[in-house]
C-alpha cells in the first residue's frame, strides 16, 4: 500500500510558504497570529 505523504518541497512551499501566505488576506491573518504568538518560524519556507 502506498503511503499518503509523498514529500515535495515545491508543493509544500507553494501551498504553505511565506509568499503563498502573503498572497491573500487570510494568509496574512495567519502570519499575524503566528507573530502575535511569538513563533520563531512563521511558515515552513521562512
UniProtKB/Swiss-Prot annotation:
GO biological process, one term: translation
Pfam families in UniProt: Ribosomal_L34
MF term (GO), any: structural constituent of ribosome
UniProt KW Ribonucleoprotein keyword: yes
Annotated keywords: Ribonucleoprotein, Ribosomal protein
Name listed for the protein in its UniProt record: Large ribosomal subunit protein bL34
Similarity remark: Belongs to the bacterial ribosomal protein bL34 family.
Keyword Metal-binding: no
PROSITE patterns: RIBOSOMAL_L34
Taxonomic lineage: Bacteria, Pseudomonadati, Pseudomonadota, Gammaproteobacteria, Enterobacterales
Transmembrane spans: none
GO cellular component terms attached to this protein's record: ribonucleoprotein complex; ribosome
Amino acid at each position: 500500500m502506498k503511503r499518503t505523504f509523498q514529500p515535495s518541497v515545491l508543493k509544500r512551499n507553494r501551498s504553505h510558504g511565506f509568499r503563498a501566505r502573503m498572497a491573500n488576506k487570510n494568509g496574512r491573518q495567519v502570519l499575524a497570529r503566528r507573530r502575535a504568538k511569538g513563533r520563531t518560524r512563521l511558515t515552513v519556507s521562512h
